[in-house]
């Protein structure tokens, strides 16, 4: 069965972005090279084109994201940010998505993920944001957390929602040169 994997970067204090959705404060020097090597499919299509990156998908063939994660692409004029993946945007507030490569899901993200898990294919990447991650917490099978050596102080939390302690077990960890640590967690 396919897994739902929340692959996310966080500050020391647990934020995935600043209050305005900004994430340019995360140090990316050696992290980008690692991402390209390990999870090239998580690089947006328009960035892949600029870099000349033609690497095949290694783990994920589907991405699920909330409106806050999708909106920066729209603001940049990109309607299909991950054209090399099956794309689902979960939002009750977007009136429509004018791109046939992106499916708008207005409700029941848990039902969506359960259906996707039953299909053949690679794993499902939960791209964010924190509200969607909080809603999908019961379905998350694995966390891949890039912990950046920076304190944000405020912003968008990795998980937003009800108090619901959910145990995960560390499976492995890797330190990158910039002080960023990547830790893989399996649902306990």
Predicted regions and their residues:
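Enzymes that bind and transform nitrogen-containing heteroaromatic metabolites
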Residues: 1-188
């Amino acid at each position: 069965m396919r897994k739902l994997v929340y692959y996310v970067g966080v500050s020391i204090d647990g934020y995935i972005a600043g209050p305005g959705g900004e994430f340019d404060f995360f140090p990316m020097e050696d992290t980008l090279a690692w991402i390209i090597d390990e999870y090239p499919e998580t690089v947006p299509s328009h960035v892949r084109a600029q870099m000349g990156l033609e690497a095949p998908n290694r783990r994920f063939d589907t991405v699920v994201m909330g409106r806050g994660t999708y909106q920066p692409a729209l603001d940049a004029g990109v309607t299909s940010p991950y054209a090399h993946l099956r794309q689902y945007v979960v939002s009750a507030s977007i009136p429509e998505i004018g791109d046939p490569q992106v499916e708008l899901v207005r409700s029941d993200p848990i039902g969506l993920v359960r259906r996707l898990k039953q299909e053949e294919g690679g794993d499902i990447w939960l791209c964010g944001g924190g509200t969607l991650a909080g809603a999908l917490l019961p379905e998350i099978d694995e966390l891949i957390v890039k912990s950046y050596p920076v304190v944000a102080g405020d912003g968008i939390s990795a998980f937003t929602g009800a108090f619901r302690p959910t145990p995960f077990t560390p499976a492995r960890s890797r330190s990158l040169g910039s002080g960023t640590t990547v830790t893989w967690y399996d649902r306990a």
